[in-house]
Amino acid sequence: MRALLVSVALLLPVPLPAQDAIRVVPVAGAAIAAGARFDIRVEATGPPGGDAPAGLTVVLDGRDITATNILAPGPGGEKGSGGAGTPDGYQPARDRAAAAPPHTTNFLRRDVALDTPGRHTLTATTAGGATATVTWDVFDWRASAPAAAPRAGNVILLLGDGLGLAARTAARALARGYTHGKADGRLAMDTMEATGLVMTSALNAFVTDSAPGMSSYVTGHKAANNMEGVYPDNTWPPRAPGQTATPVDGLALFDNPRTEYLGALLRRTRGPRFAVGLVTTADVTDATPAANAVHTSNRGAASGIASRYLDERDLNGLAVLMGGGRCHFVPRSGEAGACGRADGRDLLGEFQRAGFTAVGSRTELRALGTGGAAPPALLGLFHPSHMTVAFDKVGAGSYSDDLAADARRDLRDQPMLEEMTSAALATLSAHAPDGFYLMVEGASIDKQEHSVDAERAIWDVIEFDRAVAVALAFAARTNTDADPDNDTLVIATADHETGGLGLIGVGNPRYAPQSLGYAVRDYAAVFRFEPDQAALELFPNYERDARGFPVDPDPSRKLLVGWAAAPDYYENWLANRHPVAPATNAARVQVDGRAVTVPMPAAANPLRDGPQDTAVNGGRRVPGLLVAGIIENGATGCPARECPPDTDTAADAHSISGHTASDVPLSASGPGAASFTGTYDNTEVFARILRLAGRR
């Protein structure tokens, strides 16, 4: 028996030392514009608790660049070993990098530029035998072209956050109407010269979020969800014991390997009189605007994002910034519940001292248009957080009560998106002789789709389209004058689709909830009819004002919307006079005699169209029917030791709808618009813009 045991033991596999792992960014296959700046980071990782890999060597195109590592020496004197960050006091401060885990050895080089088009190869090795090789494709965008070739002096990119094809169709139906099966008019987006389809996936997920969705358009590089203008690295700040919230401040959130933004690249190559403008209906530190100027691994790091708009303006070229988010620009007061910056910095005052004209209301913004020349730089902060949506601004006092409360009196004087767009164009066209890049976001299309609120989402699409019309009118003037250097390229697109919005039918008045007093599924008339029902007319019958907004969101034949990526929710087919969450994931319970809010699986919110809804329609409640959701709701549960946070997405109950991976439409007008036909990746949009805007 002893001999047998020995023989068996000899046959058992002998554990081998854990192999070092190497990660390189930019990732293999990245397409990089010739001369565009980017950072290279190489991370060699040993076993947790073990020694850091030794002898990290980095070779680019056959040339050893290991010595260019900006990280401090670690144990043994090797740069970047033991997780060392940049040396204390490293300058410039924006290039500093935080420490990484001690079982890693890292390489970091900032602001690399590859001028020669073609394939470039980087190989990293360690003394332990680990190796990684990546190849990048560098494309030429500065090649000479015939004098008649299209070129864009200005670029206006309008992004409807979450704006899928169905939402465009819905806005057309409500804003223009249909007669005898044909649309009575077109949206501004419909009139653009070329349309294509964009694939939207992020670096690490089939379904993107807004941060990489935007930054892919303007860097040409993929980014991971929640990140903007950067690649992932291993310096993410660890959570303190018992900490559940994601860190929102600190060097590690702003030290990731960067990729140069379109506006910064054009400013660097065109000259310092090239300017950048960012306009949004969201908080200006939100993912989409920030993903045009600020590099961070956490889209939620609002205070630091706001600071970098100003502190890095010589690089980002920012001359116009408008939207909500005033709380991130003023110091926090001592009043309970008051918003403001924890660091006490008066960023609003600093912007003004830097030459920005600051406005805080629609009245003040309109006054700029009557006071002579447009200001050279413009900061508009019209809300403490995200701006009020179009449905509640247009419908105030009619079909919306959102702004009726005295507590919201100060929010009644907010501009519409098209007004902000006009003001931005006035400043940029007057003070940016080297051209400009303007991003305009219809932000709350997405936010209201997350809330499974069809009316508020569609109203925001109509508002967004009115901003598109302003951009097209501006381009029509510049593209027909005698100056070929001020021609304007206009693009209208989305970062992703939200909610899986589908147009399921039109309400059959026979089963209208207003008539029955409750909602039924039979109200949703579908496409199948009998031969003797040809006289039925089931098209939406909205009346609309001069701007295209319906005057009543609940006509007898309203457009009905369904959702493929929603939580559980109640549906009564009627517009909500107040914005109310579709589902909840918390409950108030008694613990030791105290009322405590505890996390729960997401469930339909009975306060919106459900059994506890106190809203009225025509003086009475109209209870809705329960619609079962399909996305993760946190009901399964998983012990933390079995589901670490970096692997489990269902730990947080999702009480809103999710994004989807559907391709999104992109429409273009102006010089080179035809190059945007077809189906292409979001990173390819960057290259197509650059080839047009880089020709001067």
Predicted regions and their residues:
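Aromatic/hydrophobic beta-strand junction motif of beta-rich domains
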Residues: I40-P48
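Low-complexity, Pro/Ser/Thr- and charge-rich linker/hinge segments at domain boundaries
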Residues: V138-L158
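Extracytoplasmic mature domains of secreted/periplasmic and thylakoid-lumen proteins
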Residues: H221-A319, F329
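Surface-exposed, short loops/turns at beta-strand junctions within beta-sandwich domains
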Residues: D111-R119
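A post-motif C-terminal structural segment
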Residues: G74-D95, F107-R109, G153-N154, L163-G220, ...
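Short, compositionally biased P/S/T/A/G/V-rich stretches that sit at domain boundaries
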Residues: A18-A36
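Short, aromatic- and glycine-rich surface loops/edge beta-strands on solvent-exposed regions
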Residues: G118-G128
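Edge beta-strands of extracellular beta-sandwich domains
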Residues: A130-F139
